[in-house]
């Protein structure tokens, strides 16, 4: 009634002393609308929302929608493949909106296996994240770039360890043992994940989610493929960029635990209920006690990121040079126990050797390089330990126990020397309290005994040449390598945490690994259009070899319990039994041929045929070759 009265008053230009204009404008009413395209065809499933609110709906089979609105609301209408549209709500009760096609989105070029395609003629399920999306974030790992950005892709963090990788699943779990997708950076399939890659060097990421898009990569693409393209320079003056960011990390949440008084009260009740005498005289005097989570967590752990780059180019070529430094301190144990540093260097360039489109043959030839080097240094603690790790002990150690042996007397010291040989001290000489509670120990003392060091050097590079043989036919050859050297060192001092957790002889464990992959690929791309018929043909070969070696050694009786001196060659091993070594090697070979045919009629009816034949040393002796075909079709 009020809305109707207001409309009549406004139409007649009258006013009424009992009607508040502000109240009228805030009155909620039903608005009906129709969403059409430029041809007058209803747009089904268009999104209509009120700006700044959670109110929204979608258009039905006839392009019609109804929505609760107020005068002055701003409606935002959007649909994939069309330009977004905004409308301000006035006094209208029926609305008609015409959406225009987003020709730029339809003409967008998307990276696919061994080439690019226009988005408008794709028949496969491919999602894309670009550098524009990255500029809004400060991710530390490539997987973090995809979090919440790509439908059908779940990103789960394995642990809170600084630099820890995330588990990526594309459209669910593919196999029981290994569901990780195949990562390909600048055409190079990677071994050991993408830790080495600096997210700020990324130009775009394409996620190949179905068999139609991933079949071109054969046997390794069963769990999907993630294609990463790094940045390159553009024609123009040199552009210098420097970015710096710093943040602070804290545990997302802490478990709610009893304080000392509550713990002693509960324990007394348990003993009484079991028919025994209470074990604590006056729980109220225990006070708050020790919150062990606060003792091991490193509050406001800093994370710092430096990024510098220079890029540019001219008529003959382009270049991109970048340096990155990431330092992430762990939220458990502090910098001495949990830390992650990554140094990255990248150089990409292209050079046009010659270009003459007037030639019938050999119209152009260009070469390029994509080179990336990364060094990672990290420290960490044991992860995902249900019982004996410091995190588990932090929530299960009694709160009425203290961190340190408080004001120890001569008798206390003598008792510790006799019964707890190797009791643990902090850097200032204070003695940690020994808590005998089976494998549940003083978590702060345990942190003092953990010494884990990892380092990793990785170089991924490729050199390529591309020749336009004649119009529409391009030949490309590339030689790539992935070299990695990584190692780990753990050392354990003589220590006594409880009768079940103790180290009677100091020891050090060292592991050294190296791996090298060589990849040689050749492709022919041919494109042809006849009237409204468009063809694209890809033929290619791929030859790959991978070799790795591992050496591991263990030695007892360190000469010095010092992180800088705890090495295998600096021990006092009394017998051959005090030392142990082992090693191993792996090798892998693969040879493949592949092809793809794309056809579309007037960019409305599309067909794609893909076939790859893999020969792999990983296959069974009697089945060393396998075929991976796919067929997909679509229309718009």
Identify the residue ranges that each predicted region occupies.
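Short, small/polar-rich motifs associated with maturation and membrane association
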Residues: 1-355, 359-367, 460-461, 553, ...
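Surface-exposed loop/interface segments of Gram-negative outer-membrane beta-barrel transport/assembly proteins
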Residues: 120, 234-289, 333-334, 338-340, ...
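Transmembrane beta-barrel architecture of outer-membrane proteins
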Residues: 141, 165, 223, 303-307, ...
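Residues on the lipid-exposed face of transmembrane beta-strands in outer-membrane beta-barrel proteins
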Residues: 230, 259, 308-314, 347-351, ...
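Outer-membrane beta-barrel strand-turn architecture
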Residues: 232, 313-314, 353-357, 361, ...
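Transmembrane beta-strand segments that form the barrel wall of outer-membrane beta-barrel proteins
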Residues: 244, 326, 607-619
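Short, contiguous hydrophobic alpha-helices characteristic of membrane insertion segments
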Residues: 595-610
């Amino acid at each position: 009634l009020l809305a109707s009265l207001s409309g009549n008053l406004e139409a007649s230009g009258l006013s009424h002393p009992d009607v508040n204009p502000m109240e009228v404008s805030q009155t909620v009413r039903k608005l009906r609308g129709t969403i059409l395209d430029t041809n007058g065809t209803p747009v089904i499933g268009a999104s209509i929302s009120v700006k700044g609110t959670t109110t929204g709906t979608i258009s039905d089979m006839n392009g019609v929608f109804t929505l609760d609105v107020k005068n002055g609301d701003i409606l935002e209408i959007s649909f994939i493949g069309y330009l977004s549209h905004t409308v301000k709500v006035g006094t209208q009760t029926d609305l008609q909106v015409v959406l225009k096609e987003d020709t730029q989105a339809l003409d967008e070029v998307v990276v696919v296996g061994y080439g690019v395609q226009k988005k408008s003629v794709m028949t496969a399920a491919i999602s894309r994240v670009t550098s524009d999306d990255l500029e809004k974030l400060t991710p530390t790992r490539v997987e973090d770039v995809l979090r919440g950005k790509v439908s059908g892709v779940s990103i789960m963090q394995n642990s809170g360890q600084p630099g820890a990788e995330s588990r990526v699943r594309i459209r669910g779990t593919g196999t029981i043992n290994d569901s990780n997708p195949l990562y390909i950076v600048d055409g190079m399939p990677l071994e050991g994940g993408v830790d080495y890659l600096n997210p700020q060097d990324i130009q775009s990421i394409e996620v190949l989610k179905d068999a139609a898009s991933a079949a071109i990569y054969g046997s390794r693409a069963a769990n999907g493929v993630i294609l990463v393209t790094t940045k390159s320079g553009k024609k123009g003056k040199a552009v210098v960029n420097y970015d710096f960011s710093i943040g602070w990390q804290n545990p997302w949440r802490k478990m709610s635990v009893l304080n000392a008084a509550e713990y002693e009260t509960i324990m007394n009740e348990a003993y009484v209920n079991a028919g025994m005498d209470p074990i604590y005289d006056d729980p109220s005097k225990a006070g708050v006690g020790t919150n062990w989570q606060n003792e091991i967590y490193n509050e406001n752990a800093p994370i710092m990121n430096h990024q510098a780059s220079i890029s540019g180019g001219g008529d003959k070529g382009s270049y991109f040079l970048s340096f990155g430094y990431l330092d992430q301190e762990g939220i458990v144990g502090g910098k001495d126990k949990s830390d992650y540093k990554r140094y990255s260097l990248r150089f990409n360039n292209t050079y046009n050797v010659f270009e003459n489109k007037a030639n019938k043959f050999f119209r152009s030839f260009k070469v390029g390089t994509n080179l990336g080097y990364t060094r990672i240094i990290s420290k960490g603690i044991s992860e995902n330990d249900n019982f004996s790790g410091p995190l588990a002990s932090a929530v299960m150690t009694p709160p009425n126990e203290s961190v340190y042996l408080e004001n120890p007397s001569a008798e206390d010291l003598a008792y510790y020397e006799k019964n707890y040989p190797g009791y643990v001290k902090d850097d200032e000489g204070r003695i940690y309290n020994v808590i005998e509670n089976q494998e549940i120990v003083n978590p702060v003392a345990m942190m003092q005994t953990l010494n884990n060091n990892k380092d990793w050097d990785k170089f991924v590079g490729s050199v390529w040449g591309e020749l336009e043989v004649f119009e529409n036919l391009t030949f490309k050859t590339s030689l790539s390598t992935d070299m990695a050297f990584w190692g780990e060192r753990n050392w354990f001092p003589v220590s006594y945490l409880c009768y079940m957790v103790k180290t009677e002889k100091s020891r050090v464990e060292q592991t050294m690994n190296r791996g090298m992959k060589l990849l040689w690929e050749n492709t022919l791309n041919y494109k042809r259009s006849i009237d409204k018929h468009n063809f694209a043909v890809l033929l290619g070969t791929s030859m790959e070899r991978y070799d790795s070696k591992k050496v591991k050694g263990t030695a007892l009786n360190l000469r010095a319990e010092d992180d800088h001196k705890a090495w295998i060659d600096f021990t006092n091993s009394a017998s051959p039994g005090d030392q142990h070594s082992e090693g191993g090697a792996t090798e892998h070979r693969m040879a493949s041929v592949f092809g793809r045919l794309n056809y579309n009629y007037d960019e409305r009816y599309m067909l794609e045929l893909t076939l790859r034949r893999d020969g792999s040393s990983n296959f069974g002796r009697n089945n060393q070759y396998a075929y991976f075909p796919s067929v997909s079709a679509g229309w718009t």
